[in-house]
């Protein structure tokens, strides 16, 4: 029974939203953020990538950098670039990519629901990344950026969302970096707010799609504040909740520097022990067509690799995943890559860059081979989370990413 509530969002005025909004903090580095912000003092990067307020080379973990985030957040409010709503609202956020639109409800979720597993995770988190986000939440006393959650379909919410989607949005813009559309509505009607709260309370669970570190950090800050100050607004953190069947997960692919001492011919022979190997030519990139099929690019040729029966267990929620099959039977068994997080011989190409990027990195000589995977499904993610298991690393890539700066949640 997820507990959610509306909140007094802190938002840019309509005429400033495109000056303020930005990409999420974790999809670009400091140099890119500095370039995108340019001379725009209203860019949210001054809050979420505050190292750009200092000379190049300043560590993003410098205590002065965190303090700058709080100073900038205060400045944005003082200047009227961010203004807090007078009443608690829910919000509706729509994203359109390649003609497909997904609609998310912006809510406040309860930190205890994260702690007790009502909000379910499917990835491990790194303590250093948690600590970074925790410090940012603490110094700003706000959830500047939302967590990306999913829920199983709900007809009542779908009808409510459709009703708002048929009206004129408050914000409506195209993000210049990727050409995706973004729309935003305020849900202030008391009856609609009550309906949203009630329908979420009927659900069994919510699922973290993207933002595991933000969730963990928000929950830790909330727990500390509850212990020190009692209950309050800090019991909750900001999330955008999408119907699971609307979400798009793209392939998250692998490129490897060498063949672990094998010749290309010997490597293909070893692959044939567990896969049906079929050359697909050198002209166009070959996309895996179904689960348990992989695409290999080696020596200028694309290959289809189909996992043979018996190489995975359909009843094992982890072992049936293509990310696990490829890690066990190719990366580990043949190439000797045992830890995807730390091995310097492997890199990952996700999202919109596509198979052409795999080809480019191999053809350049930087990498020896590329392996493309069929995308994980949202149902697989929910099955993993429901079973209490954790996805293998580098398994999911959601697009489009949430834009930051459309609304912010203050913890007091």
Q: What do the PLM-derived regions correspond to, one by one?
A:
Residues 1-412:
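Surface-exposed, charge/polar-rich loops and edge strands
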């Amino acid at each position: 029974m997820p507990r959610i509530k509306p909140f007094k969002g802190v938002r840019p005025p309509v005429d400033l939203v495109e000056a303020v909004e930005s990409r999420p903090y974790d999809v670009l580095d400091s140099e890119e953020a500095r370039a995108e912000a340019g001379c725009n003092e209203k860019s949210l990067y001054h809050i979420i990538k505050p190292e750009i307020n200092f000379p190049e080379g300043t560590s993003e973990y410098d205590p002065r950098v965190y303090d700058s985030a709080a100073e900038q957040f205060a400045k944005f409010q003082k200047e009227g670039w961010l203004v807090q709503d007078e009443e608690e609202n829910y919000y509706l956020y729509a994203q359109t990519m390649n003609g497909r639109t997904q609609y998310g409800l912006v809510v406040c979720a309860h930190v205890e629901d994260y702690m007790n597993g009502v909000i379910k995770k499917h990835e491990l988190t790194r303590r250093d990344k948690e600590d970074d986000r925790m410090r940012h939440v603490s110094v700003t006393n706000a959830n500047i950026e939302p967590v990306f959650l999913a829920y199983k379909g709900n007809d009542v919410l779908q009808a409510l969302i459709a009703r708002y989607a048929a009206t004129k949005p408050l914000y409506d813009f195209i993000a210049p970096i990727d050409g995706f559309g973004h729309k935003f509505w305020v849900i202030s009607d008391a009856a609609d707010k009550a309906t949203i709260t009630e329908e979420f309370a009927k659900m069994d669970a919510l699922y973290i799609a993207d933002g595991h570190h933000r969730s963990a950090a928000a929950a830790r800050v909330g727990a500390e504040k509850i212990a020190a100050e009692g209950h309050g607004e800090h019991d909750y953190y900001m999330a955008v909740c999408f119907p699971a069947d609307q979400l798009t997960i793209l392939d998250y692919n692998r490129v490897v520097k060498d063949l672990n001492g094998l010749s290309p011919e010997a490597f293909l022979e070893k692959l044939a022990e567990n896969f049906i190997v079929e050359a697909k030519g050198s002209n166009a990139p070959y996309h895996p067509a179904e689960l348990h099929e992989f695409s290999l690019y080696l020596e200028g040729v694309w290959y289809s690799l189909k996992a043979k029966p018996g190489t995975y267990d359909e009843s094992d929620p982890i072992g049936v995943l293509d990310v696990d099959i490829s890690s066990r039977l190719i990366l580990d068994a043949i190439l000797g890559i045992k830890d995807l997080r730390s091995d310097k011989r492997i890199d990952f190409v996700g999202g919109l860059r596509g198979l052409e990027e795999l080809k480019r990195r191999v053809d350049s000589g930087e990498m020896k081979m590329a392996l493309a995977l069929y995308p994980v499904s949202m149902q697989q993610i929910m099955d993993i989370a429901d079973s209490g298991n954790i996805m293998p690393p580098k398994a999911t890539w959601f697009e489009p990413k949430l834009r930051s700066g459309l609304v912010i949640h203050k913890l007091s």
